[in-house]
Amino acid sequence: MSDITRALVVYESMYGNTARIASAICAGLRQSSPTEIVPAYRAPTVIPGDVRLLVVGGPTHAFSMSRASTRQEARNQHTVVMPTETGIREWLDMLTADTTSTSGRRRAQVDVATFDTRIAKVRRLPGSAARSAAKVLRRLGFRVFLGSASFFVDESTGPIREVEIERARRWGEELGRLHAGSATAA
């Protein structure tokens, strides 16, 4: 196996807004390290051995990560642009129960960061897909590296403003820079 490590961004998106945020975060991360981006429905259930940073994000539904029922409700209200059967909640449930990755590394050697999208006009309401995902990842033995980030859409279907896309790219750059610095110090 190569000594080159990489980041993996796993996201859920129904209307394309969270996918745009994930892509911007990925672009920022690529300033520091090779980075792969994959939707939750195609994400590996065992974290590859060369991944040292896992970034997970999705839309906030009913104050948390989406559920099959909240995704169905969203499908009933609007046309979705991406498959919605597997969200980040289900993907996290499918992560292998084994505490090691395919290379035998402990999950605690993989840093994680989480993000979500939320409707701007209810930004002050409690609950967040990112914070919920971080709790699950911590329980699974991953090391939460940086606080969660929320990015705001005007309505549930969007649009997402360019300022939020740019903010996501900068967050990805910062995340990559901080992670590269912590890996060097370790």
Task: Please provide the spans of the model-predicted regions.
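Short histidine/acidic/glycine/proline-rich micro-motifs that form metal-
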Residues: Y15, R118-R124, V153-E155
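Glycine-rich phosphate/pyrophosphate-binding loop and the adjoining helix
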Residues: R138-A186
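N-terminal beta1-alpha1 ligand-phosphate binding loop
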Residues: S2-S32
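Hydrophobic alpha-helical packing residues
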Residues: I25, L29-R30, V136-L137, F142
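A short beta-strand-loop structural module common to alpha/beta enzyme folds
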Residues: S32-P44
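Residues at the starts of beta-strands that form the adenosine-phosphate
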Residues: T5-R6, P34-E36, D111, R143
